Amino acid sequence: MSRINLTLTAFFAGSLLASQASAQSMEETIAKAVSPLPEDLRAEATVYRYNEDTGERITLRAGSNHVECTPTDDEGFTWCYPIRDRERRDLSAKLAAEGLEGEALQTAMQAAEDAGAIEPMAFGSIIYRRFDTPDRIQYLWVIMMPDATAEELGMPTGRQRDNALAGKGTPWMMRPGTSGAHLMIPING
């Protein structure tokens, strides 16, 4: 076999292997993205990510149920949300691409909600989260409770993110009295 034929054969074989590895990698990415969900929601969940520079949504797998998930981010978090709140996440991604973060991003999102540009989170809607560090809460359910207070619902507000808890904390409320009020429920067994 000539050197050119060997080179071409090696190139095409390498390309084929790379495309198979890429497809397998995408399958693994999607499987990990839906892993925070209960088993019966995984197969039909949409999986997407955002272009960090533009905030544009990129669909990795179109689903047919009421939940959508993002692949694990650089910090080790994997999130799944109700589709109802898609516009909210899309706006957040666009604002983040413009350089907003932290409290400034939350303030901008609140202003958009107050102006009617995005709907408030539905009371009782659930967000599923997974985190890849064993000394923290790996699986967490976040129950949205806009404008609720800890006092009216009888909920604790003490954070359960202490590493000494080894990821086995108890539920607690965050951002009470705001439109972003929510209950954090650890699911780590």
Locate each region found by the language model.
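Bacterial N-terminal signal peptides that target proteins for export
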Residues: M1-T9
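Bacterial N-terminal signal peptides
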Residues: T9-L16
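N-terminal signal peptide c-region/cleavage motif recognized by signal peptidases
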Residues: A18-Q20
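Primary mode marks residue(s) on the alpha4-beta5-alpha5 output face of response regulator receiver
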Residues: Q24-G189
